[in-house]
Amino acid sequence: MPAVLPEYMGYDRTIAVFSPDGRLFQVEYAKEAVKKGTTSLGLTFKNGVVLATIKQSTDLAVPKSLEKLFKIDEHIASVASGLLADARVLVSQLRVKAQINRITYEEPIDVWSLARTLGDRMQVSTLYAGLRPFGVSFLIGGVDSSGPHIIESDPSGMLFEWQAYSIGRGAPVANKLFKEKYKPDMDEKTAVKFMIDVIKKSEKIKDSDSIEIAVIKDNVKILTEEELKKLM
């Protein structure tokens, strides 16, 4: 990222003012925080979605406290890269939104409606002085009546739908592999094995201890460590 020149320093200190060349520097810095986060990935296969992420592991940490894969509703989950404290706040809001939809309409929320809620919340933080952008990006994965979806939300609040995509520090390698080898008609087993292969190459890991993977079809299923070891 180019260095900020002295004449831009005033625009660098506030989120609510564009620089003369149309930039919001704090949003750009938030995106840099995402690039430094551990890798998170998602892909769609024939009947569902695979989400995966890497946990920062330390010897004495309780594994549950390091989670980056979040179940939001029975049919939707998410992975995040960047500041996990920011991610947890937003995930809590998404879970409430999903439950309100079930109570109000007696049906599960569709994936795009939930993603728009996330994008709107993140975008609001780019509008007002005294706030900062959320330093996190998400991949929202789920299956609804329109099929499987992977939707990215970045710190600006922009939403993109992908067949296969990665965020975080390993994204350049992972997205190159997706572009070269991804096939949308993969079955579940092939999709999970392909995802593990991409993770191993993008993060250069050899064991399953730091990997989290969820498979989403009718429901969210988070793979156990034993299941991951068999696939590795």
How would you name each of these model-derived features?
Residues 1-232:
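Long, low-complexity N-terminal extensions
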